[in-house]
């Protein structure tokens, strides 16, 4: 289970806890985890969107622990990308806080290894995606078909995660614009939407998510 140094507080703490409870400790995890993340991420995003109706401060839009949680999900997606060969291992490592690696599954289904494996920037172990059998009716998917489905699943998770972070970032920018005088050098609407120019933790995390998302757009 994902753990944070601080307990989730404020609006949407329940939804944040629901997402965090799905994440395993760092180490091997099964790919089947990823499809379970999409709906809870969407629920959290909807909750944060609704929080603007009752909260008058930027802190009300960003529950405690949101960015560490998002970074963890990003690393899990990076590990999945490496396992299924969706992106080059070095690329996956370069868009996040650390590299992801992979190990053979207990069932003997081979998984792509990561070259240049190294620990994450925090010094902790990384997540390693273990392939799980994928079926379509009675047909077991293999090779390109398997990778295609994996790509679609990872893409869905990253899309939900980016929508969540974008919602938080835009709401925070809205609050700041109402309380501060923005000069000619202020952040424009485009930067607010995509989080490329902001200096905050949310915008930086969003940029990392979008970087990986852009690498795995389904063909």
UniProtKB/Swiss-Prot annotation:
Induction: Expression is controlled by the asperlin biosynthesis cluster-specific transcription factor alnR. Coiled coil: none annotated. Disruption phenotype: Fully eliminates the production of asperlin. Residues 105-116 have a biased composition (Low complexity). Signal peptide: none annotated. Pathway: Polyketide biosynthesis. Residues 97-124 are annotated as: Disordered. It comes from the Eukaryota. Part of the gene cluster that mediates the biosynthesis of asperlin, a polyketide showing anti-inflammatory, antitumor and antibiotic activities. The first step of the asperlin biosynthesis is the production of the intermediate 2,4,6-octatrienoic acid by the highly redusing polyketide synthase alnA with cleavage of the PKS product by the esterase alnB. 2,4,6-octatrienoic acid is further converted to asperlin via several steps involving the remaining enzymes from the cluster. This is Asperlin biosynthesis cluster protein I. The lineage of its organism: Eukaryota, Fungi, Dikarya, Ascomycota, Pezizomycotina. The gene is alnI.
């Amino acid at each position: 289970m994902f753990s944070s140094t601080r307990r989730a507080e404020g609006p949407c703490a329940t939804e944040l806890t629901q997402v965090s409870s799905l994440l395993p400790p760092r180490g091997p995890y099964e790919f089947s985890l990823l499809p379970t993340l999409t709906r809870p991420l969407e629920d959290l995003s909807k909750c944060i969107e609704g929080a603007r109706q009752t909260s008058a401060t930027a802190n009300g839009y960003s529950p405690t622990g949101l960015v560490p949680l998002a970074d963890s999900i990003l690393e899990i997606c990076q590990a999945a990308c490496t396992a299924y060969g969706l992106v080059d291992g070095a690329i996956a490592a370069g868009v996040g806080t650390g590299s992801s690696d992979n190990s053979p599954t207990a069932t003997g289904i081979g998984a792509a290894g990561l070259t240049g494996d190294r620990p994450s920037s925090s010094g902790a172990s990384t997540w390693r995606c273990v392939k799980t059998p994928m079926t379509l009716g009675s047909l077991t998917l293999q090779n390109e078909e398997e990778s295609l489905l994996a790509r679609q699943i990872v893409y869905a998770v990253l899309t939900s995660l980016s929508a969540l972070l974008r919602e938080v970032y835009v709401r925070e920018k809205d609050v700041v614009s109402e309380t501060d005088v923005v000069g000619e050098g202020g952040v424009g609407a485009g930067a607010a939407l995509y989080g490329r120019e902001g200096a905050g933790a949310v915008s930086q995390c969003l940029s990392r998510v979008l970087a990986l998302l852009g690498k795995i757009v389904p063909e």
